[in-house]
A protein has these predicted regions:
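Internal acidic/polar
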Residues: 1, 90-117
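N-terminal module of bacterial RNA polymerase sigma factors
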Residues: 1-29, 36
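Sigma70-family region 2
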Residues: 12-13, 50-67
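Amphipathic, Lys/Arg- and hydrophobic-enriched alpha-helical face
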Residues: 23-41, 58, 124
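Short helix-capping/turn signature of helix-turn-helix
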Residues: 25-27, 36-37, 136-143, 153
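C-terminal flanking helix
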Residues: 27, 31, 52, 128, ...
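Arg/Lys-rich amphipathic alpha helix in sigma70-family domain 2
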Residues: 60-64, 74-94, 113
Length: 167
């Protein structure tokens, strides 16, 4: 956290290397989060890119009061939510696809894993976005319930409830 504050101060002074280091430090985490929330690699990359562009453009006014990781995760989550809402309004169809993590070379095993991923994706599409978001943040991004509660500005019991009902 102290290192993040120092990097932010350097960014405010125009140090491009500091911004690059922040990007390198958090991009994988934020990409995993965005991919889990949207289900699409390209959209996730766009969201993370836009978050960092906005962060860089507003760095002069930025004040780090908590965790930089938490702040950036909130930005990614909010932007992902906005993009999904925009899509729903525009097309009225949600086309969320989880990344296929099948790494098996065995064709029958790969088929089973693919079927399981399809079932999981279908199940996730059936639950409300708020529950899906909590489940993916906890399982896919590895965030603790307290972190999710802080990220979403909700009580811990609300987050536990969303997770429990979603599962």
């Amino acid at each position: 956290m102290l290192q993040d504050k120092l990097l932010v101060i350097k960014c405010k002074c125009g140090n491009k290397d500091a911004m690059y280091r922040i990007y390198g430090k958090y991009k994988d985490f934020l990409l995993t989060l965005a991919r889990g929330l949207t289900g699409e690699q390209e959209l996730a990359e766009d969201i993370v890119h836009d978050v960092f562009v906005n962060f860089a453009l507003s760095i002069k006014k930025f004040r780090l009061t908590g965790s930089l990781k938490g702040y950036l995760a909130t930005c990614v989550s909010n932007l992902a939510r906005d993009r999904i809402r925009t899509r729903i309004r525009q097309s009225a169809i949600i086309d969320l696809v989880m990344e296929n993590d099948c790494e098996s070379n065995n064709p029958s095993r790969k088929l089973i894993e693919t079927e399981e991923i399809i079932k999981l994706r279908d199940a996730l599409e059936q639950i409300p976005y708020e529950q899906r978001e909590v489940i993916l943040l906890h399982i896919k991004a590895g965030m603790k319930f307290r972190e999710i509660a802080a990220l979403q500005n909700q009580s811990l019991s609300t987050i536990h409830g969303r997770y429990r009902y979603g599962i």
